[in-house]
């Protein structure tokens, strides 16, 4: 008999926790896993005493669902998603809903949306952020796809999502086709940027100011009471304080080689593809790549010389505040770039994205959750057509207030030989964005010189001109510009 409100396939920890979260909010969930024994284990242990039901086959699972049937896939992105869809389609009716809650590539989601729409099935690709704890007690959810599905899943999704402010859910409809997974991808890219910025602040504290672990932990705790109030700053303080079983701090013992699952890389690739200068996320990805060359770096450290022993002789408290402001200003740049990419994607794909709503979705339940995101929502509330966060009065003033400190932190770090790829690229972007004139005129002249690619004159935009730079070349009369 149909009794379940929704089914979930994939009983890894995230799947189990999402099921328990839905159960807590009064929804009856049917659990299924490819390895069927996992269903029995889950019902006998974690789900014991709940209303969760299990199924031993996909056919049984579908038979237990109320119509329209709602099925969440929480399996490994890629082929596994397509395999389950292929098995589910013959068992479903027109108007039934399949939701992919994994870290799928947004183009795959768009393809699945179109394929399933032709078969009468409503497909949703939803970003899910917040990790295992978020899944259990309130994630950030970013659903997109076939909007006809939204009225049938809205109550469940907004019910289980994290809440902020006066109980606003960190979940709303994002947009058509792959929009939900694109927004999740950008979220993950921003997460890479936030983490790298914090690492660079930590590096300056440790190697320029010579601060001890507990001293740095206290600084991050203090910063968490300022504009930087966020989950990542909070856990950084906890990590710095944490002691191993031998009573010594754990962090200095951890191998400095950062892993990555690839979602930050996807964001950087998309930025290149759509011609958006998302420089900070790109540098954050490359910083992880460089960190992974541990053995090479050990060899290089013995052969490549940097500045002579740097001795900081300034005011320590004042420079610590410079680092904090540099971190805040760089964070603003990172989010400005992330929203530039969202805006360009919306143009490319014809999506109508609610940028303030996206900021609210990230305000709680996810890894980048912070008070700062509320300010972004406010900016888009003031001007839904805002071209760039830096042009909003609040963020313009915030960056101006940080600018002197930002430049001091970066220049001091450079003099000390500290790698700060994200601090420096953020500052370079800011300086580039605020310059009416950039030296790209020389690039255009060079391109025309060696390849007759033509250029425009400031006084005659839209007219493409070729110059015979050497006296040996020809002329270009065509106004087509394709290089």
UniProtKB/Swiss-Prot annotation:
One of its GO terms (cellular component) is extracellular exosome. Pathway: Carbohydrate degradation; pentose phosphate pathway; D-ribulose 5-phosphate from D-glucose 6-phosphate (oxidative stage): step 3/3. It is found in: Cytoplasm. PROSITE patterns: 6PGD. GO terms for molecular function: carbohydrate binding; carboxylic acid binding; NADP binding; phosphogluconate dehydrogenase (decarboxylating) activity. NADP(+) binds at residues 10-15, 33-35, 75-77, 103, 478-481. Its EC number is 1.1.1.44. Signal peptide: none annotated. Catalyzes the oxidative decarboxylation of 6-phosphogluconate to ribulose 5-phosphate and CO(2), with concomitant reduction of NADP to NADPH. Homodimer. This is 6-phosphogluconate dehydrogenase, decarboxylating. The lineage of its organism: Eukaryota, Metazoa, Chordata, Craniata, Vertebrata.
């Amino acid at each position: 008999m149909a009794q379940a409100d929704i089914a979930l396939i994939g009983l890894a920890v995230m799947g189990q926790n999402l099921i328990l979260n839905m159960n807590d909010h009064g929804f009856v969930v049917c659990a299924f896993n490819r390895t069927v024994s996992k269903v029995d284990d889950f019902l006998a242990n974690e789900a014991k005493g709940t209303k969760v039901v299990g199924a031993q086959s996909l056919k049984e699972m579908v038979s237990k669902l109320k119509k329209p049937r709602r099925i969440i896939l929480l399996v490994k992105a890629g082929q596994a998603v397509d395999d389950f869809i292929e098995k589910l389609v013959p068992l479903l009716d027109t108007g039934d809903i399949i939701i992919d809650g994994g870290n799928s590539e947004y183009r795959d989601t768009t393809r699945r949306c179109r394929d399933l729409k032709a078969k009468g099935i409503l497909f949703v690709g939803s970003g899910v952020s917040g990790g295992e704890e978020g899944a259990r007690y309130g994630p950030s959810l970013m659903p997109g796809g076939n909007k006809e599905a939204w009225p049938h899943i809205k109550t469940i999704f907004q019910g289980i999502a994290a809440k902020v402010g006066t109980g606003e859910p960190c979940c709303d409809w994002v947009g058509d086709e792959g929009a939900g997974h694109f927004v999740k991808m950008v979220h993950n890219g921003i997460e890479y940027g936030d983490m790298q910025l914090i690492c660079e602040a930590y590096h300056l504290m440790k190697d320029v100011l010579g601060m001890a672990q507990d001293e740095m932990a206290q600084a991050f705790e203090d910063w968490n009471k300022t504009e930087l109030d966020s989950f990542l700053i909070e856990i950084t303080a906890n990590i710095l304080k944490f002691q191993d079983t031998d009573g010594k701090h754990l962090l200095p013992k951890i191998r400095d080689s950062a892993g990555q699952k690839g979602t930050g890389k996807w964001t950087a690739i998309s930025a290149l593809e759509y011609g958006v200068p998302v420089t900070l996320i790109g540098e954050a990805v490359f910083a992880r790549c460089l960190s992974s060359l541990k053995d090479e770096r050990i060899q290089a450290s013995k052969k490549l010389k940097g500045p002579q022993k740097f001795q900081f002789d300034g005011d320590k408290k004042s420079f610590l505040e410079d680092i904090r402001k540099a971190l805040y200003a760089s964070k603003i740049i990172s989010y400005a770039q992330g929203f530039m990419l969202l805006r360009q994607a919306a143009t490319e794909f014809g999506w109508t994205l609610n940028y303030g709503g996206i900021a609210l979705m990230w305000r709680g339940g996810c890894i980048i959750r912070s008070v700062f995101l509320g300010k972004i929502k406010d900016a888009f509330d003031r001007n839904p057509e805002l071209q760039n966060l830096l042009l909003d009065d609040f963020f313009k003033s915030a960056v101006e207030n940080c600018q002197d400190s930002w430049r001091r932190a970066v220049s001091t770090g450079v003099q000390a030989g500290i790698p700060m790829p994200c601090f420096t690229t953020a500052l370079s972007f800011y300086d580039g964005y605020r310059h009416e004139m950039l030296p790209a005129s020389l690039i255009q002249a060079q391109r025309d010189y060696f390849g007759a690619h033509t250029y425009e004159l400031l006084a005659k935009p839209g007219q493409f001109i070729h110059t015979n730079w050497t006296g040996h070349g020809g002329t270009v009369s065509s106004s087509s510009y394709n290089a």
